[in-house]
Regions:
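Soluble metallo-hydrolase cores and metallopeptidase-like ectodomains found primarily
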Residues: 60-91, 135-214, 223-230, 234-237
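Structural recognition of the beta-strand scaffold that forms the well-ordered cores
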Residues: 43, 95-96, 122-126, 188, ...
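Metal-dependent peptidase/peptidase-like ectodomains
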Residues: 194-195, 242-342
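Solvent-exposed loop/turn segments at secondary-structure junctions
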Residues: 48-49, 101-103, 128-132, 157-158, ...
Length: 375
């Protein structure tokens, strides 16, 4: 399968929000791909409390703006909440704010703190991206929701809403949904060898189709697994593709609760994060808490054909994505995370959002470094 065929196949599953039909279908597809690569691959069931959104909106000045509830926030009664709009942090009953979806990429982010300290009865947040459509925030506290009801709306509504907030315009907001048992799965693939293993880690779920956000990491994960299975090596390999990324890394939490040594004691955790090979966004963060390893990865990327200038190479600092789960558990990680103008937006689709040449170069470089670490 060529890189182009891989991205097209990935994109064809459509929306892969955790617990949905696309999530289940793409999980079995990826398990089969890992098995075909030469690994022993299985689905590891993950149960969770699933939030099912109902129609939600804000009405003001004769307009109804449809949106999506924040998945780790509260909901309103059927009649909603009526009151004046005002800037987030004001005394207005309904707070208004604009932000980028990446601003809430880690637990305890400033917006989460603002929600905890909020005096608002409800909040509406306009999410800004290149297409300015509805690009939801990740719900880090999906298993323990808190705070006032929050309505997420398209970024294109920000100027209108902020203007109303400055004038204290009256509005009504409805944020609705229910919670039910949900089911998803991690994929766990393994190659035999000596302990401690090399761990390949990538998230596989997202809010929408999210092709550039997720598929580049999965391509690198599969490419490395295929290379490791076909090459002489000494070390065992475990490859995890986890669900629930957008819901506070639920799949990673379940995996490392079941096998804490994987996060803590693996020879290295190679974290293949978001936006690897996204079109129009060459910036790529290469970060490790192992001295010299980020520089080695950067050299491998350049050797594979990735431009050097956009690489941000760092040792230490704050790990993001699932690498944060490794860092917080005392493990050694090497992490790759890129940028994406369509981040969390429904327009992140093949072929428009994918830079095939860079995605392929990243996958080749990851496979080369993985093979070195498993030698």
């Amino acid at each position: 399968m060529t890189s182009e065929e891989f991205f097209a196949a990935y994109d064809a599953f459509g929306e892969r929000r955790t617990g949905g039909e696309g999530d289940a279908a793409s999980a079995e597809w990826l398990r089969a791909r890992a098995q075909a690569a030469g690994a022993a691959a299985m689905l590891m069931p993950v149960t969770f409390g699933r939030f099912l959104p109902d129609p939600s909106w804000l009405e003001a000045k004769g307009r109804r703006i449809e949106g999506l509830p924040l998945f780790d926030g509260g909901t309103t009664e059927e009649a909603g909440i009526s009151g004046a709009l005002g800037p987030l942090g004001s005394d207005a009953p309904i707070g208004v704010v604009e932000m980028e979806p990446r601003a809430a990429s880690l637990p305890g982010n400033p917006f989460a703190v603002a929600r905890q300290q909020s005096r608002h009865a409800a909040i509406v947040v306009a999410l800004r991206t290149q297409p300015d459509s509805l690009a939801p925030l990740n719900a880090h506290d999906a298993e323990s929701p808190f705070g006032p009801p929050v309505l997420q709306v398209a970024g294109r509504e920000a100027p209108f809403l902020l203007g109303l907030a400055e004038r204290g315009t009256a509005a009504r907001i409805v944020v609705a949904g229910s919670r039910a048992p949900g089911r998803s799965a991690n994929i766990r693939a393994s190659l035999t060898g000596e302990a401690p293993p090399l761990l390949l880690l990538t998230p596989r779920s997202s809010w929408w189709t999210s092709t550039a956000e997720r598929a580049g990491g999965i391509l690198a994960w599969l490419t490395a697994l295929e290379t490791l299975a076909a090459s002489p090596r000494r070390r065992a390999v475990v490859a995890l593709a986890t669900c629930g990324h957008e819901l506070g890394h639920i799949g990673a939490h379940r995996a490392f609760t079941a096998e804490p040594a994987l996060a803590r004691d693996s020879r290295l955790v190679l974290h293949l994060g978001a936006n690897l090979g996204c079109a129009g966004a060459e910036h790529l963060v290469v970060r490790s808490n192992v001295e010299g390893l980020a520089e080695r990865m950067a050299a491998a990327l350049v050797a594979a054909g990735h431009p050097r200038a956009p690489l941000e190479v760092a040792t230490g600092g704050k790990a993001n994505g699932e690498a944060h789960e490794i860092e917080s558990r005392g493990g050694s990680y090497l992490s790759l995370i890129g940028d994406n103008p369509w981040f969390h937006a429904p327009e992140d689709r093949w072929p428009d959002s994918v830079d095939i040449a860079r995605a392929t170069a990243i996958a080749r470089a990851v496979a080369a470094v993985a093979l070195e670490q498993a030698a």
